[in-house]
Amino acid sequence: MVVISKPLVAVLFVIGLVIGVAVGYAVAATIAPPVGPGAVAPTLKGEVPIGALLPLTGVLSSYGENDKVALEFAEKEINEWLKARGEEWYIKLYVEDSATDPKTALDKLMTLHGKGIKFIIGPMSSAEVSEIKSYADANNILVVSQSSTSPALAIEGDWIFRYVPTDLVQGPAAARVAYDQGVRYLVQVWRGDTWGDGLARATREAFLNLLKKTGQTGDVIEGVRYDPAAKEFSAEAAKLASLITDLVNKYGKDKVGIDAIGFEEMIAFIAAAKAYPILSEVKWVGSDGTAGVSGLVKEADLAEFCIKVQFLSPINAPGASPHLEKVKKAVREKLGRDPEPYAYNSYDGLWTIALALDMVDKYDSKAVKDILPEVVKRYYGASGYFELDAAGDKAFGDYELWIPWRVDGGYDWKIAGIWHGVTDTIEWAPWWTAAVK
């Protein structure tokens, strides 16, 4: 860790980035809030509350559990750093369960706001972010979502920051995975909400563009848009099986694939799909909502189905960083598993808010909002280096391709490759290349 003393009221603490003192002072001065002649800057003292809206229950609960551990780890680090510097304030994290439900998320945001909290990590799903957005904007509540990706929420000047690229980036990743596996007729199954609709659209457009660019014949078929509240999928699986059967009869199973866009309800969907042999004869591609879902590796029959259909789920890849390993270790020790990459974004979200608060030296969401993009630009944390675009979303990124696989007599998630956004190419892991020969 490198700590740079702050001139006047500014400090820039860059995790793991070794820079000279002179450079540090220059950077701090660049984004220091102005203090007029004779003015006395207000100072932070005592408890500084930060809220977190996490899906500790519902269809993103495994992610929520991971991110809670990551946030608690960040809270501990931040407070140790503040104490070592002799600061008179400390971070206090207030976690509420959003239940992966938009209405619950709004209710819990209002609860946190009622306690005077003006800074929030989460919620995770785009449907939740969409629901809370108006209230957050109206009340100057700064929200940092670690995983909301809907392009519909990329709005310049609002109070929502997202430390992940939108699905205008993820869509091409999923399209490339399906295309490179030989799929030319892609049937979509998706969660009918803000996130699912946006990702389905982005993937469809990217896949059709690939077909056009390469001169290949093919199509994207609107398969099943399901209710996000659904718990059982026998009817949806039957409809999907009928569509796939017709396409396989026309074009052959090697050219037909399924684009499955959902959260943990995909466990139940795949369980229903197993009743139709044709659905295990074509390739599947998932999304960031299924990457790392623990329920898909707990049951052997579900894991084997995923292996057979090569169920690769793209999820935004963290950059190389030694701090990633610290967070991963903390989650592994507490929960016995590796976290999804969004846990690293949660960790970085709390750190960057804390750094911005330290710079403005007051509990002022507007002051933090004004400098947060510059803090992020000079920050190097668990998810690596990144910048925010004009809408406050992560501006770029590659995607890891996660898949359930056989590990040590059981099953776990492994990374089969990385999709590189700049070149629209996939770098496959050697183990995966050998496994699918």
Give, region by region, the residue ranges found by the protein language model.
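Extracytosolic ligand-binding ectodomains
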Residues: 2-437
